[in-house]
UniProtKB/Swiss-Prot annotation:
One of its GO terms (cellular component) is nucleus. It comes from Rattus norvegicus (Rat). A motif (WRPW motif) lies at residues 172-175. Residues 124-145 have a biased composition (Low complexity). Transcription repression requires formation of a complex with a corepressor protein of the Groucho/TLE family. It is found in: Nucleus. It comes from the Eukaryota. It holds the Pfam family HLH. InterPro entries: bHLH_dom (IPR011598), HES_HEY (IPR050370), HLH_DNA-bd_sf (IPR036638), Orange_dom (IPR003650). The gene is Hes3. Has a particular type of basic domain (presence of a helix-interrupting proline) that binds to the N-box (CACNAG), rather than the canonical E-box (CANNTG). SMART domains: HLH. Residues 65-98 form the Orange domain. Residues 124-175 are annotated as: Disordered. This is Transcription factor HES-3.
Length: 175
């Protein structure tokens, strides 16, 4: 039993020695490392590793999380508090959008400012020269993929900019 334990210790020390020789090759200079030297160099390496990673792996304690949450909550609630007429949430984008409708087919600059990172759902516009029947601003079920009406969801924009609709198409926005 003692032989097996010593064999395991010696095997582990030999593995540590070979690892340390690669890392501390300039300090070892081909001398035979004793067991105490191997252990000292191992401790030195682990401490240097901990010191180098200390700034990178800051683990917040349980006390920091609630205080950070409480610190950010007033700013969020101030940003999202009801407007002057208590009609809903006060948001810069919502205030700019209040004057318009939920469908937008005209100004591409407004579309890119109001929804820089939200995908738009394209729907066919009213037929040219015909009477305008009331349409639901919502696409039919399955309209996000491909349906019999030909409504397609646009591919996600790589630069988070809203794309301009094709002529004769309107954009439905949920706000």
């Amino acid at each position: 039993m003692e032989k097996k334990r010593r064999a395991r210790i010696n095997l582990s020390l030999e593995q540590l020695r070979s690892l340390l020789e690669r890392h501390y090759s300039h300090q070892i200079r081909k001398r035979k490392l004793e067991k105490a030297d191997i252990l000292e160099l191992s401790v030195k390496y682990v401490r240097s590793l901990q010191n180098s990673l200390q700034g990178l792996w800051l683990v917040p304690s349980g006390v920091d999380y609630p205080s950070g949450f409480r610190g950010g909550l007033p700013g969020s609630s101030q940003r999202l508090r009801p407007g002057e007429d208590d009609s809903g949430l006060r948001c810069p984008l919502l205030l700019q959008r209040r004057a318009g409708s939920t469908t937008d087919s005209a100004n591409p600059q407004t579309a890119s400012v109001l929804s820089p990172c939200l995908p738009a759902i394209w729907a066919p516009g009213p037929p040219a020269g015909g009477s305008q029947s009331p349409q639901s601003p919502f696409p039919p079920l399955g309209g996000l993929l491909e349906s019999s009406t030909g409504i397609l969801a646009p591919p996600p924009a790589s630069n988070c900019q809203a794309e301009n609709p094709r002529p004769g198409f309107r954009v439905w926005r949920p706000w």
